[in-house]
Amino acid sequence: MQTIKVRGVSGLLAYRVLARTVNTALLILVLLMAAATAARAEPVTIVVLGDSLTAGYGLDADDAFPARLQVALAADGVDAVVINAGVSGDTSAGGLSRLVWSMGDAPDLAIIELGANDALRGLAPDATYENLSAILQWLDDQRIPGLLAGMLAPPNMGEDYGRAFNAIFPALAVNHGVPLYPFFLAGVIGEPRLLQDDGMHPTPEGVELIAAGILPFVVQALGAVVVN
């Protein structure tokens, strides 16, 4: 009888230890899940590295592309902070020179909108390609997802230049494996009501159209980071 009693007590103690272990494990699991949920609840961060088309030349800050993209994302159920890293007049070389500090603490996505001023100045397409390639390579090295916004050369630059320049962006997208929004000014350029008096920079209505056009590409590029 004594042996049976000892075994019963031992079994009870073992059960209590097991129960405490399971409860502790469950508590840890709940805490981890809560932490993960809180982390996912944080807004995603997007940096737009660009020129005056990003900076919002001639516009109020709330009408600039990054601000309107943030509003468009929110309307689509994506909680995001879109940072304006645009500098008017900037070229691909200028964007490369300020790349590291512009990216800050590794955003969830970097949108690269550069090249328009390269074309307007007639800079060598090969140089533009190399600068943008270096930007995309750095993003890849830092494991920052990128989205490339394409640009087209103005017709007055001539067919040869236009052919060489326009081929830059599809080639970069293929060679670096990044998504491409083919033409940043799609639906806006050539539409006077959507352009400022200079015929180059979009009005607030033009920016709204740009944000709406690129929105699906941004959401797709964010991928698993986005929690609706």
Residue ranges and their predicted role:
Residues 89-93:
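Acidic-and-aromatic substrate-binding clefts and catalytic sites of carbohydrate-active enzymes
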Residues 19-22, 116-117:
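Residue-level micro-sites within transmembrane alpha helices that shape
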Residues 21-35:
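Bacterial N-terminal signal peptides
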Residues 78, 94-228:
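Alpha-helical cap/lid subdomain in secreted, periplasmic
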Residues 40-88, 98-106:
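Serine-esterase "nucleophile elbow" of acetyl-processing enzymes
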Residues 3-4, 36-39:
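Oligomerization/assembly interface segments of phage tail-like spikes and tubes
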Residues 1-20:
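N-terminal secretory signal peptides that target proteins for export/translocation
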